[in-house]
Structures are given as C-alpha cells and as structure tokens.
Amino acid sequence: MNDDKKDFVGRDLYQLIRNAKDKIKIDYKFWYTQPVPKINDEFDENVNEPFISDNKVEDVRKEEYKLPSGYAWCVCDITKENDRSDIYNLLTDNYVEDDDNVFRFNYSSEFLLWALSSPNYVKNWHIGVKYESTNKLVGFISAIPIDMCVNKNIIKMAEVNFLCVHKSLRSKRLAPVLIKEITRRINLESIWQAIYTAGVYLPKPISTARYFHRSINVKKLIEIGFSCLNTRLTMSRAIKLYRIDDTLNIKNLRLMKKKDIDGLQKLLNEHLKQYNLHAIFSKEDVAHWFTPIDQVIYTYVNEENGEIKDLISFYSLPSKVLGNNKYNILNAAFSFYNITTTTTFKNLIQDAICLAKRNNFDVFNALEVMDNYSVFQDLKFGEGDGSLKYYLYNWKCASCHPSKIGIVLL
C-alpha cells in the first residue's frame, strides 16, 4: 500500500468493531474455569476433539443462575417489535462506539430479526436481564444453532453473539453470569460446543483476522472524520484515487431469487470444504441467510445453464454519526460470502464494491478470511488497526491462518 492510501485510512471503522466486542472485558480467571485452551496451550494438527466429552443433559443444572438483587432474567421474543426495540436501545447505547464517541453501530430492528431468527432457533437462547423496578433491559446475550465443520469433523454448535451489559452495571460482573446462563441453556439442548468472536484476547483464539476497508463515498468519509487528508493527498486526488468503475465484470449478476436456493446451497457447501472452519448450510439456512432484504442482506448470483456459478453477498451495518451537522448515518457494507467459478476473485470483489456503491454504501469492509486478503492491495483496501479473534468453546484443535477460516459471524 502506498503512503497516500495509508494516510487516507485515518479514523478506522474497525475501532467500532473492536470496541463492540471489547465492551465486556472478562478476566482470565473466569475463562480458566471453562473448557477452553489456556494461553500457552498448543495443539498439533492431529488433535480435534472436545475438552469434555462425557456430557449428559441430565447432569446440567436445572435452575437459572442467580442474579444480583433487583434484577431478573427474561426471554426476549425476537418476533415482537417491542422486544427488538429493547435490544436495539441497549445495543445502541452500550454495545458499540468509538473512543471519541463519534460513531455508534446502528443495528436496525430488521437486522436483529435476521441475525437472531435463523432456522431452528431456540427462543430461550435470547436471554435478557431486566431491572425489576423499571422493567428496563440492562443485559443481553444470544445464541443460534449452527452446524459447523472443524477440520472435517461435523459438530452441532451454538453461535454466541451480542453479549452486552449496560454501562452503569459493569462493576456487577453480569457478563460471566450471562455466559454461564447461555451455556446452561445451550447444554439443555444437548449441544456442548460453541463458536464466538471478540476483539479482546481471551484464552485462546483458533485464529485472528484483521478488518480491511475500501472507501466508496470518499468526500463523505473525510467530512465525517472517518478518513483524513494530508499535504500529499488532497480531496480531489483522494476522490480520483478511490474512483469506482460502474461497469460489472460479471455481466449477468442479479439479485438472488427463491429458485436459486438449491444451486446456491451446492455452490456454498462445495466451496467451503477447503477451509478448516466453516458452516454447513441446509436449504433452510441458505433461504434465511441469503434471500435479499433491503438494508439488511444483499445477495447477487450469476446463473449459467441453470447452475449458480458466482455469488456476491454483503450485509448492511450502518453507524450513527454523532455531532456532525451534515451527516447522521455512515452506511457500511460488510463482506459476507463471495464465490466465483467463472472469473478471478479480484474481478468478483471489484463487482461487490461496485454493487455496494450502487446501493448507496459509503464503505465496503472485509475480514482477511477465506480468499479476501489476496485482493486487498490491488483493490485499494486500507488495513484496520485491530483484529477479530475466532474462538471455539469446548473444542481443542490446532490454530490456523485466517485464510483457512471459512465463516463470517455477524
């Protein structure tokens, strides 16, 4: 990356992503009581097994974990607008913001419904903590079921996400209680493994991946303080440097339709086999995760002779812009799954950026997982200043390079 590009990536959206995961910092003392690797543990490639393998549902604690006086457990019904609104308000005010309090993730109600209502989701895995005197939601954690493949071993897991505790209650150490309670409820369904990500380093990641950003609306990114200029990089030069060609390399790309589900399932599962860690998608999974929803998930396919040959997908996660008189929203697209069999991967991601621009996104973000890193320099992505760690719960295996990670968690 040349100096101009390095200087241009000033305020980094990764700061938001990292802080979203860092808000709850749990010391290692708690994690050393859990079936996860210790900091100094190293496993060779032949190790691929649970830490604890003799679990039985009848041995799982039947009663909920005790909360501090004045607080009560609740189940958040993701199908109800009021419950989604409570989750939205908690996350908006307490889950994500950058150090300068300029950007805050803005999870829409529709996004939360998409993220948490996957096929066969378990209602009571959407766990809330309410302050009894006001009935206000002050804590939340969620999980959804997922079929994972770890080094060719297929495992039913829970994907854990959205751990959030109100800022005023951080001293009450609610986060470990939330984690233990979600673990208990997952175990009651005879599921003993989980996958999760965090910006903070915990015992111990299976892999670590950095975020990279491709500027789209250059002028806006500079005006809101997301990116910056310098003496060598003027506004006009920056706009020219990051100009996006509006012509697609794959001419027949179109929005995914219901009739594409079978072909897309085949393309996805066949492609993902090459990675050490990946999900296995059922037809119902494909329908849920990839059917386009405006301002939530964008999926484009190229169909040739009745077969799905290429896939582009990205999801929308905007941020509120605070204290700016001209703009109040930063529209960010996040790379999801992208597969090509007819062109180069560079051409595919170039088309993804073009489609993000057509849908009025300001920036296109991607982790260095799967094949993504190979195109970042050529397509003028800027490197983020932090990393996202991938973790497995109750599973021991060798760590791997992020290019061998084949899953994107929201």
UniProtKB/Swiss-Prot annotation:
Sorted UniProt keywords: Acyltransferase, Cytoplasm, Transferase
Main EC class the enzyme belongs to: transferase
Keyword Cytoplasm in annotation: yes
GO BP terms in the entry: N-terminal peptidyl-glycine N-myristoylation; protein localization to membrane
PROSITE patterns membership: NMT_1, NMT_2
EC number per UniProt: 2.3.1.97
Substrates-to-products reaction catalysed: N-terminal glycyl-[protein] + tetradecanoyl-CoA = N-tetradecanoylglycyl-[protein] + CoA + H(+)
Compartments it resides in: Cytoplasm
Coarse class of the protein's main subcellular location: cytoplasm
Identification of the protein by name: Glycylpeptide N-tetradecanoyltransferase
Lineage, opening ranks: Eukaryota, Sar, Alveolata, Apicomplexa, Aconoidasida
Encoding gene, per UniProt annotation: NMT
